[in-house]
UniProtKB/Swiss-Prot annotation:
The function of this enzyme is unclear as allantoicase activity is not known to exist in mammals. It comes from Mus musculus (Mouse). PANTHER family: ALLANTOICASE, INACTIVE ALLANTOICASE-RELATED. InterPro entries: Allantoicase (IPR005164), Allantoicase_dom (IPR015908), Galactose-bd-like_sf (IPR008979). This is Probable inactive allantoicase. Belongs to the allantoicase family. HAMAP family: Allantoicase. GO terms for molecular function: allantoicase activity. It comes from the Eukaryota. GO terms for biological process: allantoin catabolic process.
């Protein structure tokens, strides 16, 4: 167990807990099977909210628990469950949270994974339904056998689960794999409870199967976009901006602290832009190099803390160049960013759809930087366009059709 799961050079200096939870119910994660759900169903594992404790609440089966808890095993074997990831992708790290399970937590666990096609998963596993107080039937065991989950690859070998504080017992595990996964199997030995299972990673899209006539969000975290640098994330990480679906609340966005270098009395230019010395920024590696044709900036829920203005720039970097930029906190004066969106005034609690009209948009980029002034929050950032490896796109201003190809030294999904 570790308190701060910071990653090293091999995984590009990222804190994996700031990545998307690929198994969460809010992105489509689904429990396919569990050996036993007596005290608490396995669906609790993939809830998006943190576990809670209700001291005086009981069910007809025992103490109410906010997690997956099996009965005390009195037959041979151990308990396990199978989860279909809501977003298929590369797993960077796993958090097995046993908060509030003092006296009942599973003492050991392991995690396996598989990359299954739709044909592989077309088994006759029946719908789960209401599971509390039940165990898997012989028919359900027979149906799940078709997945051959016992032979899946191990991401985490059998490991001891350790209790920490009653309300914060996280067990973090790094995953060193570049494979794409669609399903995971959580084994607990021999029985017990787990509050939450977080499977952190980045999505990975099948770009070859993409409809090349429609623009796609090239920075979406579900496809592999990721934040690789930022100036401030006091109230919310920039990765929230490229999350799945519509923002759910003010917590589901990027928000900075108030800048302390704000002038005592604010002044504005004729076009309404504040005259302030400072700004905040966040840099993203696109899910795939490409050409950006439309920019969407949503300030929903940011009513009294919306930035006054923003701009978006793009550039093209190799893997080594990106690592050099990270080491220098994205402050290398010699590096040239190209404008994708000039300084634009933002309106609170509103979605801004902005078509870029500059010739620079015909350049392929791998990274994008959003800069807000002076500070504040943004709920969603969408950079829509065409992937470089497959796009045949009609650029603006009636230029000839251009075909782009991926250069050596670039990575589409990391």
């Amino acid at each position: 167990m570790t308190d701060t799961p910071k990653e090293g050079k091999l995984t590009r200096f990222l804190d994996f807990t700031q990545l998307i939870d690929l198994a969460s119910e809010c992105v489509g994660g689904k429990v396919l099977f569990a050996t036993d759900d007596f005290f608490g169903p396995a669906e609790n594992l993939i809830k998006s909210d943190s576990p809670t404790f209700k001291e005086h609440e009981y069910t007809e089966f025992g103490k109410w628990v906010d997690g997956w808890e099996t009965r005390r095993k009195r037959i041979p074997g151990h308990d396990w469950c199978v989860i279909q990831l809501g977003i298929q992708g590369i797993i960077r790290g796993i958090d097995v949270d046993i908060s509030y399970f003092s006296g009942n937590h599973a003492p050991r666990m392991s995690i396996q994974a598989a990359n299954l096609s739709e044909e592989d998963t077309m088994s006759n596993i029946p719908p789960r339904g209401v599971r509390m107080g039940t165990a898997a039937t012989p028919e359900e065991f027979e149906a799940v056998t078709e997945l051959k989950s016992h032979s899946w690859d191990y991401l985490v070998p059998m490991s001891e689960l350790k209790l920490g504080d009653p309300d914060s017992s996280h067990n973090y595990y790094f995953v060193n794999s570049q494979q794409r996964w669609t399903h995971i199997r959580l084994n607990i030995f021999p029985d017990g409870g787990v509050a939450r299972l977080r499977v952190y990673g980045t999505g990975q899209r099948d770009w070859a199967a993409l409809d090349s006539t429609e623009p796609v969000d090239l920075v979406a975290i579900a496809f592999g976009g990721v934040c690789v640098g930022f100036s401030n994330a006091h109230f919310g990480h920039p990765n929230n901006m490229i999350g799945v679906g519509e923002p759910k609340s003010i917590a589901d966005g990027w928000e900075t602290a108030r800048r302390l270098d704000r002038p005592p009395v604010l002044e504005a230019s004729e076009n309404g832009l504040l005259l302030v010395p400072g700004c905040e920024w966040a840099v993203f590696r696109l899910a795939h190099p490409g050409v950006i044709t439309q920019i969407e900036i949503d300030t929903k829920y940011f009513k009294g803390n919306c930035p006054n203005s923003c701009k978006v720039d793009g550039c093209i970097l190799t893997t080594l160049e990106e690592e050099d930029m990270i080491r220098h906190n994205w402050n290398l004066p010699a590096h040239k960013w190209k404008s994708l969106l000039p300084v634009t005034k933002l309106i609170p609690n509103q979605n801004h759809l902005l078509d870029s009209l500059t010739l620079e948009l015909q350049d392929v980029i791998t990274h994008a930087m959003i800069t807000i002034a002076p500070d504040g929050g943004v709920s969603r950032l969408r950079l829509k366009g065409f992937p470089s490896s497959i796009c045949l796109l009609r650029p603006l201003r009636e230029k000839p059709l251009l075909r782009f190809s991926l250069k050596t030294g670039f990575r589409a999904n990391l």
